[in-house]
């Protein structure tokens, strides 16, 4: 497992998002897709993201996990720029994050988890069955992107710790990379856990981001 850390200014990401009329989350997903085209050597990148469904389920303060996951993809070529792909990506994200869509997706995914858990089988068998469900449902992707922390509470100990600690997140079965984005003091930190064997991810992310005028403060492969 390779680890990569990238730090960029939040304002530069917000500026690119505003220029293209999309959310910063979508701009970040688009930037990562451009970088991974070079890194993975693929012209179509699949990405997944999760959404909190506690509010839609009527339990906004619940302490347990209450999420649903979505997957989408983007086709790229060597001339593709961020502005070419993010409008459609943003429309897809907004469509999936409607309350009805989130509840429907959560119900489908959690019903599968419940059915697997009810099986009278060893844990290793349940894990394999659950992995099969991930493949069947289309959840595996080239990268998973998620956000940690409440941006209105930027100084929480959990968030401060995570900018230095990768042990919270690993890629799911079928996913090449897990990307956790945290925002603290105007800096977005990407902690990336990568199953792919090729070196050089940090440099390719820096190149792709800076080509789109993102201010990259750090891009380093930690396991070289």
At which residue positions do the language-model features occur?
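Generic structural signal for individual residues within well-ordered alpha-helical segments
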Residues: 14, 28-29, 86
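Acyl-thioester-dependent acyl-group transfer interface
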Residues: 5, 36-224
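Short amphipathic alpha-helical segments
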Residues: 24-33
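Flexible, P/S/T/G-rich "lid" or insertion loops adjacent to the active sites of thioester-utilizing
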Residues: 1-22
């Amino acid at each position: 497992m390779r680890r990569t850390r990238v730090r960029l200014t939040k304002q530069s990401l917000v500026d690119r998002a505003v220029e293209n009329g999309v959310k910063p989350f979508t701009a970040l997903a688009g930037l990562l897709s451009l970088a991974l085209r070079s890194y993975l050597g693929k012209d179509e990148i699949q990405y997944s993201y999760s959404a909190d469904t506690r509010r839609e389920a009527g339990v906004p303060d619940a302490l347990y996990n209450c999420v649903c996951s979505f997957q989408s993809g983007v086709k790229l070529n060597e001339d593709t720029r961020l502005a070419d792909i993010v409008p459609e990506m943003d429309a897809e994200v907004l469509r999936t994050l409607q309350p009805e869509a989130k509840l429907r997706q959560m119900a489908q995914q959690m019903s599968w988890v419940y059915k697997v858990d009810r099986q009278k089988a060893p844990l290793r068998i349940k894990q394999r069955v659950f992995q099969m469900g991930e493949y069947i449902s289309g959840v595996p992707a080239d990268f998973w992107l998620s956000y940690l922390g409440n941006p209105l509470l930027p100084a929480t100990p959990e968030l401060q710790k995570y900018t230095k600690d990768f042990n919270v997140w690993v890629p799911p079965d079928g996913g090449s990379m897990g990307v956790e984005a945290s925002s603290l003091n105007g800096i977005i930190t990407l902690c990336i856990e990568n199953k792919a064997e090729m070196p050089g991810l940090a440099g390719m992310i820096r190149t792709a981001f800076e080509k789109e005028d993102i201010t990259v403060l750090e891009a380093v492969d930690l396991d070289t």
